[in-house]
Design a protein with these regions (language model features):
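Active-site neighborhood of HAD-like aspartate-dependent phosphohydrolases
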Residues: 63-107
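Metal-dependent phosphoesterase signature
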Residues: 75-90, 116-124, 139-140, 162-171
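Alpha-helix N-cap recognition
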Residues: 38, 83, 228-231
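Catalytic-core segments of class I nucleotidyltransferases/pyrophosphorylases
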Residues: 1-55
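Substrate-recognition element of Asp-dependent hydrolases with the DxDx(T/V) motif
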Residues: 93, 97-136, 143-156, 206
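Asp-based, Mg2+/Mn2+-dependent phosphohydrolase catalytic module
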Residues: 124, 128-145, 155-157, 162-195, ...
Length: 242
């Protein structure tokens, strides 16, 4: 029997029931995804198509990225950060990342987390910390496209350590392994990308990967240096408009 047409809310009435039944699957992608269920959003998507943004974000094309260190670059440095409660953004960090998002840069976190090897933080607890970071960014309209971390540390012989992570690895900055992994996953052109951080290890990783480098908050060994992440974002986005 034919039923009378009725309006449905795609999210609440179709997708959420499928999710509850375990019948909905998804994957994370930095490619262009936009809800265009209103005339205003439809016009925005049309503009993005005409500008070439939709095509440019397709991962079949090489991408440009800004790799960001975490502690002391995005959030306040507190030594070994061990809980989500310690996560606090630096002033203007979210606004800087939002500016990079809006300018079409992939924003990828690349961070050393030896607290895993030290046995002080579990992988699940680190996920909670990063969830808090992403929530704080999201409240300001900003986001990171991916998070890569190194759990290793080469120094051995400490109480509570996890021996499987006490190794010489290729991903602990200043080695470039995290950046290489991201480049493979997201088709990133490293020569057109930047590594930004507050330490010489960040600058070393960026240079080893073939990226341009920018030190912030006092780090001077990069190709460029800026007082804050916000100043870097203004420089990069302003240069593209020039």
């Amino acid at each position: 029997m034919l039923q009378k047409p009725e309006k449905l809310d795609l999210d609440r009435q179709v997708l959420k029931p499928l999710l509850a039944d375990g019948l909905l699957y998804a994957y994370q992608s930095p490619e262009y995804v936009k809800d265009m269920g209103t005339p205003e959003r439809y016009e925005m998507v049309q503009r993005d198509i005409r500008s070439g943004l939709v095509s440019a974000r397709n991962l079949s094309n090489p991408q440009k990225a800004v790799f960001l260190d975490r502690d002391g670059t995005i959030n306040k440095y507190v030594g070994f950060l061990r809980s989500a409660e310690q996560m606090e953004l630096l002033p203007q960090a979210a606004q800087a990342i939002r500016k990079l998002n809006e300018a079409g840069w992939l924003v990828i976190l690349a961070t050393n987390q030896p607290v895993i090897a030290r046995g002080e933080v579990s992988e699940e607890e680190l996920t909670e910390i990063h969830n808090k970071l992403e929530t704080l960014l999201g409240k300001e309209g900003a986001y990171v496209d991916a998070i890569y971390y190194c759990p290793h540390h080469p120094d051995k012989g400490f109480a509570g350590e996890r021996p499987e992570y006490k190794i010489e690895c290729s991903c602990r900055k200043p080695k470039p392994g995290l950046l290489f992994r991201a480049a493979q996953d997201y088709h990133i052109d490293l020569k057109k990308s930047w590594m930004v951080g507050d330490s010489a290890a960040d600058m070393g990783a960026g240079k080893a990967a073939g990226c341009k480098t920018a030190g912030v908050y006092g780090e001077k060994s990069g190709d460029e240096s800026f007082a804050t992440l916000a100043e870097f974002a203004a420089f990069l986005c302003g240069r593209e408009k020039a």
